[in-house]
Amino acid sequence: MTSSFNPKKESILDLQKFLGKEICVKFTGGREVQGILKGYDQLVNITLDQTQEFIRDAEDPLITTDEKRFLGLVVCRGSSVMMVCPTEGCEPIDNPY
């Protein structure tokens, strides 16, 4: 007996409005990249172009240095994506703790 019920798989994030725009992606493990969103799927696998990685301080991994590394075209695995945010319209604030 087969079931005719096939639920549609929808993305947990609606990134459609950010296609072609610059976004910031943070990963489990602390890495952080910034690039232009070229595509995504329902599992939040993300494709970024003109991607740069922010290098962390060797002595304190919670601190991001001014140093960047150019990566180019990157495919980010959805299971390691912790946060996605637009770079336009956002401004960083100091840690309140």
UniProtKB/Swiss-Prot annotation:
One of its GO terms (cellular component) is nucleolus. The keyword Translocase does not apply. It comes from the Eukaryota. Pfam families: LSM. Keywords: mRNA processing, mRNA splicing, Nucleus, Ribonucleoprotein, RNA-binding, Spliceosome. Residues 10-90 form the Sm domain. Component of the precatalytic spliceosome (spliceosome B complex). Component of the U4/U6-U5 tri-snRNP complex, a building block of the precatalytic spliceosome (spliceosome B complex). LSM2, LSM3, LSM4, LSM5, LSM6, LSM7 and LSM8 form a heptameric, ring-shaped subcomplex (the LSM2-8 complex) that is part of the U4/U6-U5 tri-snRNP complex and the precatalytic spliceosome. Belongs to the snRNP Sm proteins family. This is Probable U6 snRNA-associated Sm-like protein LSm7. It comes from Dictyostelium discoideum (Social amoeba).
